[in-house]
């Protein structure tokens, strides 16, 4: 419902003020002060509402109210302040001593608003114009009362757009080594081929400098620390990246520290092995968790955790062999120097390329009885007298 306006009360006088009422109001305020405007009319003996008494006193009866017409200089100040502040008549009146906000508003609406366009064409800003100093403390205090934004503070949308524009600039300054080391979630693509030396200087490169041919020849190596219980995989705590198989019977040594960072995002090779492992339960681990294979980007975190659990557990060899035989039937094959036919697939475990060129049938894993954190993966070429193994077998051995 709200409070009933005081002017609607029965018996109150409305309309023009008489000289006797002005005298009663001026004498009471001179003796007792303004006080409460709601109780002032009754105490002063006036049949007026409190709002009418307040407006009459502030706009007409005060001693510091300036009488007479508004001068030409005051018009210039009003126009310039209105162009800066808008319809904030109280702030404009604070720069014109003796003039009330109501008087300035009425003068603007009745005279200046009609002549503003002619005035702007006639009076252009020149070097001899008098500058108007705006009291910023009053402006900020008025903003706090009205709930406006403090001057000088940009909106959130503009700030976010500015940050996005700075991030999208290709010619921006490169981040320092401290900033690069503060984000361990971002992986590095390391390709120690002839086109890119293994240097520890931390120099950056581009995708065009690396070339796609070297990556296809040796495969993508992605280094990213992973922690699961007491098993920690990383650049400093793991030796899993020490030996990287590149084919039947061959290994490549990778540096564990001081790897060159690349500006390109890590690219993951999608093959039938990845798709099969991502769409089927992992070696009968008890729970069927699946993830979607992607041709670009980083594999899901749950995919890494499941593969780490696969290393820690000891599944039956027949499960892996049967699963490998069923999932690798459509993989492309090649023939190496020894006459064995192997599959060009990548076995990715815990964001590491564990082994390549796994056989399509008859493959088996030999798991150690006691798993240690410091372990490595080796690709051992099978002897010629082993007809049941086509190309190689992966052994996890203790150091």
From Swiss-Prot:
Keyword Nucleotide-binding: no
Low complexity bias spans: 170-184, 191-206
One cellular component (GO) term of this entry: nucleus
Keyword Nucleus: yes
GO biological process: regulation of DNA-templated transcription
Keywords: DNA-binding, Nucleus, Repeat, Transcription, Transcription regulation
UniProt domain HTH myb-type: residue ranges: 9-61, 62-116
DNA-binding annotation, residue ranges on this chain: 37-61, 89-112
Location of the protein in the cell: Nucleus
Region (Disordered): 138-222, 242-262
Location, primary (coarse class): nucleus
SMART domains xref list: SANT
UniProt GO molecular function: cis-regulatory region sequence-specific DNA binding
Domain of life per record: Eukaryota
Job of this protein: Transcription factor postulated to regulate the biosynthetic pathway of a flavonoid-derived pigment in certain floral tissues.
The protein's name: Myb-related protein P
Species name: Zea mays (Maize)
């Amino acid at each position: 419902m709200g409070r009933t306006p005081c002017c609607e009360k029965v018996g109150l006088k409305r309309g023009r003020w008489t000289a006797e009422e002005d005298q009663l109001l001026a004498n009471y305020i001179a003796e007792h002060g303004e006080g409460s405007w709601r109780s002032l009319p009754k105490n002063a003996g006036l049949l007026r509402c409190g709002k009418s008494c307040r407006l009459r006193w502030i706009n007409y009866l005060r001693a510091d109210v300036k009488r007479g017409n508004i001068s030409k200089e005051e018009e210039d100040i009003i126009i310039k302040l209105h162009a800066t502040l808008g319809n904030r008549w109280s702030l404009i009146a604070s720069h014109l001593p003796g003039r009330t906000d109501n008087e300035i508003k009425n003068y603007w609406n009745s005279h200046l608003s009609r002549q503003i366009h002619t005035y702007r064409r006639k009076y252009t800003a020149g070097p001899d114009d008098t500058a108007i100093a705006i009291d910023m403390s009053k402006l900020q205090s008025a903003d706090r009362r009205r709930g406006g934004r403090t001057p000088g503070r940009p909106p959130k949308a503009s700030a976010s757009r500015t940050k996005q524009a700075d991030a999208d600039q290709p010619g921006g300054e490169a981040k320092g080594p401290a900033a690069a080391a503060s984000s361990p979630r971002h992986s590095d693509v390391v390709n120690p081929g002839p086109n890119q030396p293994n240097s520890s200087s931390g120099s950056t490169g581009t995708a065009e400098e690396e070339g796609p041919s070297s990556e296809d020849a040796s495969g993508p190596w992605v280094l990213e620390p992973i922690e699961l219980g007491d098993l920690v995989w990383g650049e400093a705590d793991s030796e899993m990246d020490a030996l990287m198989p590149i084919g039947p019977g061959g290994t490549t040594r990778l540096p564990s520290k001081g790897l060159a960072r690349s500006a390109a995002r890590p690219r993951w090779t999608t093959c039938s092995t990845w798709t099969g492992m991502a769409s089927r339960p992992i070696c009968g681990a008890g729970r069927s968790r699946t993830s979607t294979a992607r041709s670009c980007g980083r594999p899901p975190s749950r995919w890494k955790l499941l593969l780490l659990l696969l290393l820690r557990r000891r599944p039956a060899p027949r499960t892996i062999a049967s699963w490998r035989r069923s999932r690798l039937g459509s993989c492309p094959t090649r023939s190496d120097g020894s006459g064995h036919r192997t599959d060009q697939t990548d076995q990715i475990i815990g964001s590491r390329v564990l082994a390549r060129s796994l056989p399509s049938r008859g493959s088996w894993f030999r798991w150690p009885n006691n798993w240690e954190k410091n372990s490595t993966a080796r690709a051992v070429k099978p002897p010629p007298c082993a007809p049941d193994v086509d190309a190689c077998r992966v052994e996890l051995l203790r150091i």
